[in-house]
Every structure is written in C-alpha cells, then in structure tokens.
A protein has these predicted regions:
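Alpha/beta catalytic cores of nucleotide-metabolism and tRNA/nucleoside-modifying enzymes
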Residues: 1-22, 205-238, 243-421
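Active-site entrance/lid segments in N-terminal catalytic domains of soluble metabolic enzymes
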Residues: 1-235, 263-268
C-alpha cells in the first residue's frame, strides 16, 4: 500500500476567519441551540461521552438542565456476574424515557435483535416508543456491527417502535461513505486516539487528525444526502481531542453536527468522577460517582460561586441552619484544591466497573487528575457566550448557518503559538 502524502490537520492547526462585515448588532441575536434534529431540539450541539466519570443516574438531569445531552455509560447498572437482563432492568426507565443509553454490542443484540427482554408481562421494547441507544465500541470499522444494527432497525419497524442508533468510532472518511451506502445508522462518532484519556494512537499508531476527518466526512455527507443508493447519512459527532471552548466551535465550523466531550466534562464539579479535596488542615475523598453526597461536597456545591453569590443554588439543596452555614464558610476558606480522577473506558479500572469478574484486556486508556475550575452551569454559560461571539464575528445567526459554512485558516507554527497562549 502506498504512503498517503496529503497533509491532514487537527484543531490546533486551524482558526476561523471572520466575515468581511457582519450585520449582527449584538451576539445575543445569535442562537447556538439545535432546532432541526428532533432528538436534540433546543439543546446545545453537545453530548457527554459515555464515560463512568461524567454522567450517571444521580447527576443526569444536571446536564439536561444546562442544555448538554447526557449519555448513560455502560457501567451504570452493570451486574457483577455479567447479567444483561439485570443491567437492562436497572436502566429500563432511562430507555423508556427516550434518554441516550450506552450499550455493548452484545447487550444491543440481546435487547433489540433477539428480543430476550420480551418476557410475559414485560413488553420491552414497547410499542410506539422511541429508544435512543449508543452501541459503544472502540472499533467502529467492524462489518458485523452494522449487520446487527440493520437487523435491529428492521425488527423495530416490524414491531412498531423507533430505534435511534449511534455508534463508532471510525477514523477513515471512506468508512463514513461505506456506512451511508450499507447501514442504517443515525449518528456516527468520529476519531480514534485523539481523546486525552486514550492511548490507542500512541500504542497502535491508529489515528486520523480529527479536523480533516470531520471536513472529509462532511463533504461525503453533503454528496450522499437524497441519493437513491444511500441507506443513511448519519449525523457527524466529533468525539475526542477537545481541549476547550474553541475546539468545540471549530468542530462545528468544520461541519460536525455535534461534539462529544469526555475529560473536559470530567473536570466539572458535578461530574460523576470521585472528588479529592485538598485542604490546608485536612484531606477528604468523596465518592460522588457512587451517589454519596455528604457534608463536604455540599459545602463546596452551595458556595462554589463565592459567598457573595449564595443565591445561585438552583440545582442544590439550601440549608438554613446558621451554625452549619458558618461551618461551610470555614470549610471553603480552608479548601486548597479540588481534583477529579479521569480515566478512559478502555482502562482496566473502567473494565472492572463494567464487569468485575471479566478478564481485563490490555489497556488503551490512561488515568489523569484534573483540577476542578467550574460547575456544569458555569461551563455551559461560557460555551453559550463563546458560541454566540464566534457566530456574530462570522455573521451567522443560527447554528445551522454556522455549521460547515464558515472559512477556516491553516496556520503556520508561529501563528499557532500566538493563538495557544
């Protein structure tokens, strides 16, 4: 096989060119919310990654409230003995509610192809319901994955329920073209090896720079839409490698329909990752991931925005006891740092969360510790403002006009240094 000599680009290589002149008077005129896709209507174009350190059954609605679409990861409800039925029973309310839930290929086949949950008195999947499922694999290039999805889609039609399927990950734009022709996929996750907790590229050399991948898939999608030979034109999800607000905006500017965020969300205060609180006079560890929310974490949550902004507690419980309030203030003064543990789902730790008795595979993930700087609300508010600002510079009032319809500049190495301060 020949060496491909065409240069490929990552987010770091690009910046967005402003319009020559903008008719927008204020960035408040710009609307960064999704309105075209019924599955994501009125949300920001953002998913949480299906990682055990981000969303769980305890904080699920916090993400929703802040217009970020949460994904319930594969460890939630996982049975120590590997029982698929017990796991599905635990998360059934999320599935019935139409929430996004991550399943393994085996779980997906068990429920939506073999219909093994349709026991007497328990009709599941249910008639006229909509199920939103992410078949969560590392390797989205396997033909058997798409054969299974096609079977499940046909069975769903024959049984009068709707099945919305996300899968991936892929790292070749020609794979996207193949999926358009051969598979009924609704959403596809792009990128292998670009996530900060992923070491696949480092250890296997499988990698495709994500900015070029998004751009190439976008052009294929545009050419395939409406063609008779096409089975689907999946929404493009840029998954991995997002270091901050600018990378989210670049991904959408390149043509991604959505961005999926992992470790960046792990570092937010309410994420499912355990807290490590360092104080000047003491040291605390709190397992928020297990739903243990005790005084220490409540202290931080209630006073996160500072003592002068104590009314900003809409997602939290207020305690009126004056003595306890004083304790909280003292705790905040004593607090030095908050750290969250972030690890990829292919780490041995994450594998054990999904199935404690299974033999661990060679890890293609790593563990990092992230300093907490923001709440989910603070991050979301900032993202909205930065989105609106970028849209106003490029003279785009609506996200669908901004997506894939602005010009990007390839920068020199010295220009990149000037941007990445």
């Amino acid at each position: 096989m020949p060496i491909i000599e065409k240069t490929k680009y990552s987010y770091n290589d690009l910046t967005i060119e402003p319009a020559v002149i903008s008719s927008i008077k204020s960035r408040k005129e710009c609307d960064p919310y999704e309105h075209m896709d019924v599955n994501m209507r009125d949300y920001l174009p953002l998913f949480t990654a299906p990682m055990s350190t981000i969303a769980n059954e305890h904080n699920f609605n916090i993400w929703k409230k802040n217009k970020i679409m949460p994904m319930l990861p594969r460890n939630i409800g996982a049975d120590p003995n590997g029982s698929i039925e017990k796991r599905i029973s635990y998360i059934k309310d999320f599935l019935d509610n139409g929430d996004w839930v991550a399943l393994s290929l085996k779980e997906f086949e068990y429920v939506f192809v073999e219909h093994k949950m349709m026991s007497p008195g328990q009709i599941f999947p249910g008639y006229n319901r909509t199920y939103r499922v992410c078949v969560d694999l590392a390797n989205g290039h396997m033909e058997c994955l798409y054969d299974t999805i096609n079977k499940a889609k046909e069975i769903a039609r024959n049984n009068n329920y709707t099945l919305i399927v996300m899968t991936g990950n892929i790292a070749n734009s020609e794979t996207y073209r193949w999926i358009c022709k051969h598979a009924e996929v609704d959403y596809i996750r792009l990128s292998i090896g670009s996530g900060s907790n992923c070491i696949t590229a480092t250890q296997t050399s499988i990698y495709y720079p994500i900015a070029s991948l998004i751009d190439e898939c976008k052009h294929i999608k545009n050419r395939c839409e409406g063609k008779s030979y096409v089975k689907s034109t999946p929404y493009i999800i840029a998954d991995g490698g997002v270091r901050g607000y600018a990378d989210v905006i670049k991904a959408i500017a390149l043509g991604a329909d959505y961005v999926m965020i992992g470790s960046l969300f792990t570092g937010l205060l309410e994420s499912a990752a355990p807290l490590d609180i360092e104080c000047y006079n003491s040291h605390y560890k709190y397992g928020y991931a297990a739903g243990i929310i005790n005084d220490g974490i409540n202290n931080i949550l209630n006073l996160w925005d500072g003592l002068e902004d104590e009314d900003n507690n809409d997602t939290l419980v207020k305690i009126d006891n004056k003595e306890l309030e004083q304790k909280k203030k003292d705790f905040i003064k004593d607090m030095k740092d908050i750290v969250k543990e972030s690890y990829g789902m292919s780490t041995k730790k994450a594998q054990k969360l999904i199935n404690p008795n299974a033999k661990s595979k060679t890890s293609e993930g790593c563990t990092k510790y992230i300093h907490v700087k923001e709440t989910v609300k603070q991050w979301s508010d900032n993202m909205i403002d930065y989105f609106r600002s970028a849209m106003s510079y490029t003279d785009k009032k609506y996200i669908n006009d901004f997506r894939g319809k602005v010009d990007l500049i390839i920068n020199s190495s010295s220009a990149i240094l000037a941007v990445n301060k």
